Amino acid sequence: MAAPAPVDWRVTLRQRVAIVAVTTAAWVGCIEARLVYLQLFKRADLLARAERQQMRTQTVPPKRGDILDRRGRILATSVDADSIYAVPTEIANAEGAVKQLCAALEDCTARERQNLIERLGQQKAFAYVRRQIAPDQAKRVAALNLDGIGFIKESKRFYPNKELAAHLLGYVGIDNTGLDGLEATYDSRIRGKAGTMLVQTDARRHVFSRFERPPTYGSTVELSIDEYLQHIAERELHNGVLVNRALGGTAIVMNPRTGEILAMANEPTFNPNTYREAEEAARRNRAVQDLYEPGSTFKVVTASAAIEEKVMNPDTLIDTNPGRLVIDRSRVITDDTGRNSGVLSFANVIIKSSNIGAVKIGFKVGTDRLSRFVSLYGFGLQVSPDFPAENGGIVWSPEKWTDSALASVSLG
């Protein structure tokens, strides 16, 4: 049997080199094809992804405009306050950093402490530690000189007169948004326009650049309120509530010629600087949200309807004898004095607040005309856009007015 021919090592080498060359060419071709695909078809997506990974944008709240009284005195303003932020990617030991931060802040709860450990342990470029802190807290935290911890100047709402005009002014949340009162009604005007802070990081998420576009200040709003009159109204209302052991009360001072509100006070009240500590009932603006019967003040509406419709004049005599008036066979109306007032002039009916006289005037005016004047005076309607929560009141439809209802409306 013949021996096998010897294998030429040169042929084997050439075959192996050819295999390696083909494999390498195919591998390089795949890489090039992938690169072409990424550059031609995925370029925009990759650029956007890289930008998202390297750049973080944080909103910087604007400074709200001031709220002034009619003489330019400040009722609400904004002051600078430090907010602590962290760059978690620059913090090697989150638990240790939180321990030092809470020691400096002095009032961390167990829940806040745990929440901070979790947030500072995440691989993020930005996280708030605490916002709008007190100056002494800011000094203590700054003295720690911790890596990855910095400060942002934010705007904090401040009410220098504390409880004064609290229900009118309302209050502002942590994000600089008006939550109640005029702060909420005129929020878009007072708030201003937010700025931005751009943070750039490298591949290891280390911050190498920060850029801030400053916010735009909000507009100043001037009210018809007079700070001095507001103070007097609140003081006297408070004393009246104490003396009468009342649950609450309202006092309003108006300019009768223009309808301007010069003061609006409510009891109980609250401090808008610390509104979270106040009960909801104390934050309610009773002057515009609660319902009240107008009482004898409504007699002027009845009287003005009679004069305008020329039903009576100020010299018309009205007989209130015998000191009682029966309506619908069962309802008896008397004057509050409990005595027979006799014959009164139209003017004296109003001066003495005679119930019987007012009812007789109302019956002369009639349901249709009196109901029209009730509407003309704005009863049952919201009278000001300044108070979105205003309760317009309850006014019966004239079709439902009985004689007893007409009597009730006439005397208030």
What is the predicted function of each stretch?
Residues 126, 148, 204-249:
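Conserved, well-ordered alpha-helix/loop/beta-strand core segments that scaffold catalytic motifs
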Residues 62, 78-83, 88, 98, ...:
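Short beta->alpha transition motifs characteristic of CBS
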Residues 4, 76, 201-212, 225, ...:
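Beta-lactam-recognizing serine transpeptidase/beta-lactamase-like catalytic domain environment
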Residues 1-13:
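N-terminal Lys/Arg-rich, disordered targeting/topogenic segments
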Residues 11-45:
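Hydrophobic alpha-helical transmembrane signal-anchor segments
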Residues 15, 41, 90, 96-106, ...:
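Small/polar-residue-rich segments within soluble enzyme cores
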Residues 54, 59-63, 194, 245-248:
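Short, small/polar residue-rich loop motifs at catalytic or cofactor-binding pockets
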